[in-house]
């Protein structure tokens, strides 16, 4: 049960980070030079 909870939390954190980085990389006012991949 504890392992399943860690797996679920890691998946949620992963998708949240993908959403946040995708939003920031598509926002020219926050990232005009697109240097988020460095």
From Swiss-Prot:
GO annotation (BP), single: photosynthesis
Task performed by this protein: One of the components of the core complex of photosystem II (PSII), required for its stability and/or assembly. PSII is a light-driven water:plastoquinone oxidoreductase that uses light energy to abstract electrons from H(2)O, generating O(2) and a proton gradient subsequently used for ATP formation. It consists of a core antenna complex that captures photons, and an electron transfer chain that converts photonic excitation into a charge separation.
Lineage: Eukaryota, Rhodophyta, Bangiophyceae, Cyanidiales, Cyanidiaceae
Subcellular location(s) per record: Plastid, Chloroplast thylakoid membrane
Listed name of the protein: Photosystem II reaction center protein I
Protein source organism: Cyanidium caldarium (Red alga)
Keywords (A to Z) from UniProt: Chloroplast, Membrane, Photosynthesis, Photosystem II, Plastid, Reaction center, Thylakoid, Transmembrane, Transmembrane helix
InterPro entries the UniProt entry points to: PSII_PsbI, PSII_PsbI_sf
GO CC annotation: chloroplast thylakoid membrane; photosystem II reaction center
Topological category with respect to the lipid bilayer: Single-pass membrane protein
Keyword Thylakoid among UniProt keywords: yes
Regions that span the bilayer: 4-24
Family according to the record: Belongs to the PsbI family.
Keyword Lyase carried by entry: no
HAMAP family in UniProt: PSII_PsbI
């Amino acid at each position: 049960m504890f392992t399943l909870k860690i797996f679920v939390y890691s998946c949620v954190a992963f998708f949240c980070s993908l959403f946040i980085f995708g939003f920031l990389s598509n926002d020219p006012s926050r990232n005009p030079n697109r240097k988020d991949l460095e």
